[in-house]
Amino acid sequence: MARLLQASCLLSLLLAGFVSQSRGQEKSKMDCHGGISGTIYEYGALTIDGEEYIPFKQYAGKYVLFVNVASYUGLTGQYIELNALQEELAPFGLVILGFPCNQFGKQEPGENSEILPTLKYVRPGGGFVPNFQLFEKGDVNGEKEQKFYTFLKNSCPPTSELLGTSDRLFWEPMKVHDIRWNFEKFLVGPDGIPIMRWHHRTTVSNVKMDILSYMRRQAALGVKRK
């Protein structure tokens, strides 16, 4: 119980610095549906070097943040913030997973072998190296979308009613639950069930605040059960 109380106090302190930033951001986040059938642990993906298939059940008991990423996007700077998020919340059980995709404005044009060098020397550049796992480039929407993204999208309402400019979106057929752009995010809980979905323009600091708020609520529930 002492550990749960300590975790709750730490989360409260972290949240205190982000309350003011959360106002007006509610529409940038959607809670996922209740009564979801199945879990993310039924799926997995190949690492960016193609050398290892990682079943997502490896992350059982962790909070997992799924992010579709791109190297030549106006939001590519989020990589730096995601590194900071991973480092800060890893002690609380957060794991970030990145999935390169070229379906939005053709902003991830390179081969898998080119993505890490691009991040290091071009964008964000400056020797940047992600501290979270990246997987092989693939589709998140359309006929060839990765199956775990089908599961995530069907589990959570879309973050916007509009898909965007059709000449910058490269998949068919287009569906209401589709991901709108690079750097949209899904949070999956320790039980493998999706919890939240964020619009791509939601700041990482607000994503962080939402995650901490949820963790704090869960920690409080754990204390009450004791």
Curated annotation (Swiss-Prot):
Q: Hey, what tissues is this thing expressed in? A: Secreted in plasma.
Q: What class of enzyme is it?
A: oxidoreductase
Which keywords label this protein?
Answer: Oxidoreductase, Peroxidase, Secreted, Selenocysteine, Signal
Pfam families, per the entry: GSHPx (PF00255)
- Report what the Swiss-Prot or TrEMBL entry states about this protein's PTMs: The N-terminus is blocked.
Which GO MF terms does the UniProt record name? Answer: glutathione peroxidase activity; identical protein binding; selenium binding
Record-level GO cellular component terms = extracellular exosome; extracellular region; extracellular space
Q: Taxonomically, which superkingdom? A: Eukaryota
Location comes to: Secreted
Q: Which Gene3D superfamilies match?
A: Glutaredoxin
Reaction(s) catalysed by this chain, per the record, are: 2 glutathione + H2O2 = glutathione disulfide + 2 H2O; tert-butyl hydroperoxide + 2 glutathione = tert-butanol + glutathione disulfide + H2O
Active site at 73
* Gene Ontology biological process: hydrogen peroxide catabolic process; response to lipid hydroperoxide
Provide the E.C. number(s) assigned to this enzyme. Answer: 1.11.1.9
Which residues does UniProt assign to the signal peptide? 1-20
Its function, per the record, reads: Protects cells and enzymes from oxidative damage, by catalyzing the reduction of hydrogen peroxide, lipid peroxides and organic hydroperoxide, by glutathione.
Question: Family per UniProt?
Answer: Belongs to the glutathione peroxidase family.
Its assembly, as annotated, is: Homotetramer.
According to UniProt, the name of this protein is Glutathione peroxidase 3
Q: Which gene encodes it?
A: GPX3
